[in-house]
């Protein structure tokens, strides 16, 4: 049975202990190589997985680390010392261009905590915001200020949790990052079945946002809503004031907006175009970009039926002269006026009288 915290007893890419003095070539089987190359075990592809029950692999299925290193630039040697929990395996990530990822090997219960996340401790003033800080998490003080960052970008500070990728959207997210004390943990937010990649991002289930005090949780929001009829302005101002970016102190009215904004500082771009692999920090920006590939134009003008791929294009069109209806449409039911001549004043008066008579309501005696 799996405990509430994933144990740190795992081994070299496969279940079971590595015997003392066992060479790396003796534990890398064809099945492990298949997983490394294609991202899943063979049984996921409909083939039967034949595990070697002994500690020694068959010479026909064993591959030397030197041969693998030539193909993967020494990645296998790095992974040979990686300690994995028995509940997970490492394989090619399902996210394009992200390299290796962590997949569940057995069922992982909701609420299971993994960690702590390890790495170098960096003071906030020493963080280079121009770098790719995807492998970095912030740790907060009780007053909501950043205490330090945990950076796992250097190889000698990496653990198996480093290979867990960030979720691109809420639908694929199955882990959330939580702060317990001064340590960072990943927590399963749902029951995770076998052969599913572990993907993490910030969560909403706790009364604090990544341990930041003062951010209203569910219970606090429910209490606040009871008093909104009496203090609506104060309530809205207080919520926006508490949800502030810890780096630039900009205020937000929701946690999702704050999480999206934080990607500007971390340079995290989890949204990848499936056509050109270009990366974006916002899902809405990715959707607009994909329309350039697909030719989709969902925004249509109701007057002239012109179509646009982005809402900004439609709004610009609506402000232009092309969007205005023809002026003749307003004159369709107006009587034609004669050309001006010497008796124009008299004719104009007669036309006005006729028009007035035309619009007088009929009276029934």
UniProtKB/Swiss-Prot annotation:
Molecular function as annotated in GO: DNA binding; histone chaperone activity; histone methyltransferase binding; methyltransferase activity; zinc ion binding
Subcellular location: Nucleus
Disordered as annotated region, ranges: 318-338
Zinc finger (C2H2-type): 243-265, 271-293, 299-323
Comp. bias (Low complexity): 329-338
Keywords, comma-separated and alphabetical: Activator, DNA-binding, Metal-binding, Nucleus, Repeat, Repressor, Transcription, Transcription regulation, Zinc, Zinc-finger
Name of this protein: PR domain zinc finger protein 12
GO cellular component: nucleoplasm; nucleus
Subunit structure, interactors included: Interacts with EHMT2.
Coiled coil: none
One Pfam match: PRDM2_PR
UniProt cross-references to Gene3D superfamilies, sorted A to Z: Classic Zinc Finger, SET domain
Gene Ontology BP term (one): methylation
Function, in words: Transcriptional regulator necessary for the development of nociceptive neurons, playing a key role in determining the nociceptive lineage from neural crest cell progenitors. Initiates neurogenesis and activates downstream pro-neuronal transcription factors, such as NEUROD1, BRN3A, and ISL1, specifically within nociceptive neurons, while repressing non-nociceptor cell fates. Essential for the proper function of nociceptors in adults, influencing both their excitability and their gene expression, thereby impacting how these neurons respond to various pain stimuli.
